[in-house]
Amino acid sequence: MHMQRYSSAAIMNLHRSFLARQTPIMKTKMVNPFIESKKACDVFINHRGIDTKRTIATLLYDHLSWLNLQPFLDNKNMKPGDKLFDNIDNAIRNCKIGITVFSPNYCKSYFCLHELALFMESKKKVIPIFCDIKPSELRVVNNGNVPLKDLERFNLALEEAKYTVGLTFNSSKGNLSDVVKNASEIVIESLIEMESEQKMIKSSRNTPMAL
């Protein structure tokens, strides 16, 4: 399955349309990521650090920031002394969209799977990027240290993510800038769609019922 693709001109129009909805202060202020980590973010980037932090995850964060969006990446938005689970869980519950970068060592991380499960439990839209791994290869690793309740959460979340249309990237053949650009375009499209849906819901609630 393939995601709907837009021309570059259409994407630029979508981006301008999205920014036009933001307040002037949002578009011009200098952002302190440590302060913004306490607030709602547009996009939470879920990834395995040893695989993708120095590549696709950081490039995504930088590109989304350049687009005047508010992404969340643990090493960018958190500082020494912050409580890990409190900050991560709060950011996920308050984000608008999640990007999950699946990679060969992803399923070995309790934190990665916890974040993914929280996405699904919070009913967030998740954009999967399968980096050097196929969806069919993703399996929860049970080393005996994970509580049964969490194993069930992780398996359910992983199965849902595996059957969600996403992007694929092969680091030996692909171009990082292409997958970053494509993922960013999907984020913008999704944010605009979500905003339109929210406006329709709000409008319907404010419309008086005919007698």
Where are these regions (language model features)?
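Conserved N-terminal substructure of TIR/SEFIR domains
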Residues: 2-97, 121-124, 182-211
